Amino acid sequence: FHKTYYHPSNSYIYLCGDMDVDEYLTFIDEHYLKDFDKKQIDSSWEKQEPFTEVKRVEEYYPVGENDSEEEKTYLSYNAVIGDSLDAKLYLGFEILNRVLFDAPGAPVKKALMDAQIGKDIQSSYDNGIMQPVFSVIAQEARDDQEDEFVKILEKNLAKIAKEGIPRRNLLAAFNYYEFKYREANFGRFPKGLMYGLQMYDSWLYDDEKPFIHIKTN
């Protein structure tokens, strides 16, 4: 596997910044690429078809020998969201994640916390894969809270889908992301690295679309 796929012929190289591009490409060739022969690598993939019904998976993890097993359950609700080549959906779910779960007073997180489902609620939007996955996780919950977790989550999402989201909440999320991207504020990570990773979210799946998510910025 490693010998087949971990090869320059199956790699993506990008340069970021004000530079002499020819100089850097020559350097990369002389110090890296020239030592390999080009070869054809089939790294194609097929989309996973939607499930015909909800799938429930139960797994176990270890706790300390002297730790109680009470309130150590992690409940996770997950759904595939389109594909990463849909730029509007990609950005839209970043906004929704902020509004519904991450922002102060986020309504769905608040509903779950008010019901004391677990000790904390986390959400994630994994859009770095072809078929992005949105997840909601209740941490350190009780075993018997699974049904209530699903019920409250689906009820609140259905209510929001029907009644909509207050305009001020959406504007706050828009402002949050506009500031983040205009200022290239990626915390401890250099912006050149983060731009590259964001390019890969589409470039890996369509050679003609490396910049669709960068253009959003």
What is the meaning of each model-derived region?
Residues 55-62:
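Short amphipathic
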Residues 1-52, 65-93, 98-217:
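Charge-rich, well-structured scaffold segments of protease-associated domains
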